[in-house]
Every structure is written in structure tokens, then in C-alpha cells.
Design a protein with these regions (language model features):
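Beta-sheet-rich non-transmembrane sensory/scaffold domains
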Residues: 1-244
Length: 244
């Protein structure tokens, strides 16, 4: 994670290393187009808190301004000429403006980070033709759309919000449910709650029906929690929580 580049190791079925390819910082997921060319890599480039004194205790600093944050990226490894001759193209988000993304409800929020640094590719899927890739940007509550033919990131699209006040939805926001023999009991359930939640997907897959590409996402929800930065809090820790 501390290196400027991550590595993808290409091996044959017997485990022999054919080539090692440098990709973006902190690779998280490796995927394939339908024809296996190119190989796709999502690299998060997550923030790294500074060390107070790495020669002694190696305790991380709690000062977020001292953290380093590498660019998130998507790497395209071309193996059409064989694994031993593989080449790589690394795409990042340098062309995307932070202010414009914020206006479109894309979360860009780590202190001092640009959009290119803050967006963290998590997981990748492609369409059936292998011409488009869809990349989850979990912490940003968004997905990136990649043109695999022209090797460019076309868009970063916010996934919006789930309205928990809608009729028929039941909301359980408590992590203090009682259990009996490991089974949840007496869940705290509310309806009509005036809250909106973010989807923040992790894994993504795709399928085609009636000529249309559909994306299926596992909406895990996530928070950033480091020694130098933590965004999570409970209602009890916020002002005005009693009135809610």
C-alpha cells in the first residue's frame, strides 16, 4: 500500500510467472472482458496516514493534513500479444473537476484531496460486448463508466439516495438489537423516517436482457475510518439528535 504502484502478476496454469505488470496504487479487484483482453484492474489509492516516527513506534499520526493520498485508477492490461508481452494503460480521474462532481452529488470529501485522489475504484464489470466497463466508487456513492475501445473514463455518475420516508419501507438504524442464541430478536423498526441513505456499492455485476445492459450492485454502505480521519458518527453524537 505504501508503494507508488501496485503489481499484477501474470502466471500460467502451472503457476509459472510470465510477467509482472505495474498498475495503480493499491489494486483491489482484477476482472476480465468477455474475450479476456484486456485484463482490468481497479486500484483504490486509499489515503495513508502519516507515521509519527517509523523508526520507533510506527504510530500513525491523527493529523489528516499529513496523510498522503494516491490517485485512484483503472488499469487496462493488454495481453493480446501474449502475457509475456503485456502492456498496460492506466486511467485516472485527473480530468474530473471536484466542484463539478460535488454539484452532481458525487462524494469527494477527504480533507485536502483532489477528485483524482479521492475517487477509489473498488470493483469492475463489463457489458457483454466488452466495450464498456462499469466501476464502483464505493466511498463516493458513484460509478465510473469506462470506454474500453478508446481507453478513457467517460463519466462519474452519482447513484443518488434512498428515501426512507417512502411508503412501505421499514428502517432499522440501530446496531443494538438484542440477540438470542446468535439470532437477532426484537429489531428496532421505523416507518416514514425522514432520512435518506447512500447506496455505496462494493461488488458489481452485469447482465443483458432484451438488448439492454443491467447492473447489479451489492450496496454495502461504507465509511472511511483511519487513525487520522473518521467520518462515522451516531445520532447520539450529533447536535439536535434529541429532537429527532
Amino acid at each position: 500500500q505504501t508503494a507508488s504502484s501496485g503489481l499484477v502478476v501474470l502466471m500460467d496454469a502451472d503457476g509459472r510467472v510470465l510477467k509482472t505488470v505495474a498498475v495503480g496504487n493499491l489494486p483491489d479487484h482484477v476482472s476480465f472482458t468477455p474475450d479476456k483482453k484486456p485484463i482490468l484492474v481497479a486500484s483504490e489509492g486509499s489515503p495513508i496516514c502519516a507515521l509519527d516516527d517509523i523508526s520507533t513506534s510506527a504510530t500513525e499520526s491523527t493529523d489528516s493534513t499529513l496523510a498522503s493520498d494516491a490517485n485512484g485508477s483503472v488499469s487496462l492490461i493488454d495481453v493480446s500479444g501474449g502475457a509475456a508481452n503485456a502492456t498496460v494503460t492506466i486511467l485516472d480521474f485527473s480530468s474530473f473537476d471536484k466542484t463539478a462532481l460535488l454539484a452532481e452529488d458525487v462524494r469527494v470529501f477527504f480533507p485536502g484531496s483532489s477528485a483524482a485522489q479521492d475517487l477509489e475504484p473498488e470493483y469492475i464489470t463489463t457489458n457483454a460486448a466488452g466495450t464498456r466497463a462499469y466501476v464502483t466508487l464505493q466511498e463516493a456513492n458513484a460509478i465510473a463508466i469506462v470506454d474500453l475501445v478508446n481507453k478513457t473514463i467517460l463519466d462519474v455518475a452519482s447513484l443518488g439516495y434512498k428515501d426512507w420516508s417512502a411508503t412501505g419501507l421499514v428502517y432499522d438504524g440501530s446496531k443494538k438489537d438484542s440477540t438470542s442464541n446468535g439470532v437477532f430478536a426484537n429489531p428496532i423498526a421505523y416507518t416514514g423516517v425522514p432520512l435518506k441513505g447512500m447506496y455505496m456499492p462494493d461488488t458489481i455485476a452485469s447482465y443483458t436482457a432484451a438488448g439492454q445492459t443491467y447492473l447489479v450492485m451489492a450496496n454495502e454502505g461504507d465509511t472511511r475510518e483511519y487513525s487520522c480521519y473518521e467520518e462515522e458518527s451516531t445520532f447520539g453524537d450529533t447536535s439536535g439528535s434529541n429532537s429527532f
